[in-house]
């Protein structure tokens, strides 16, 4: 599995493309207009050498802090998941965290498929004015086998060191290469003990 990171997900969302996507997906016109009102009206000032410009309208960006924002970005990036979908490869995403999962008996084959899928991601990013942050990528190989040869197989992506890790966090859940979830259970137990000790001190 290759875990990607979109740089400035909310800030780089094109208003024009988002509204077009809503129309293409068949949303009612009033939904499109409400969304237009939600994302429009953002302005900024440019500062250079102590000089401040007049207000400039911003044509990209979704307001942060609203429960509507992650939903709009998921709609904006939905085409990416459709592009990644194939017989042995699929994508999952929540806001700027996107994961590509591929399955085969060979780690080398998986790495090649992940590289191909990543190229599709880059093509989508160029089309939508989005940038990925390869220095924040993470790679992990999963297997249930006792003998785990080849789990150190790297992936070749510009800007990413390509080395697989032993575990990573997916939407708050720690997963390891053996899919034992021991680290997640350990972290949960540590948090529970910390809260219990704090409660006992109050009592």
Labelled PLM ranges:
Residues 72-76, 113-117, 188, 192-195:
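Hydrophobic alpha-helical membrane-association signature
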Residues 5, 22, 35, 46, ...:
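Mobile genetic element proteins and their domesticated derivatives, centered on retroelements
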Residues 50, 119, 131-168:
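Short, conserved micro-motifs composed of acidic
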Residues 70-105:
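Active-site palm subdomain of RNA-directed nucleic acid polymerases
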Residues 30-35, 130-136:
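Acidic/histidine metal-binding catalytic segments
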Residues 1-63, 102-103:
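Conserved pre-catalytic core of RNA-dependent polymerases
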Residues 6-25, 61-62, 99-126, 144-146, ...:
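Catalytic palm subdomain of template-directed nucleic-acid polymerases
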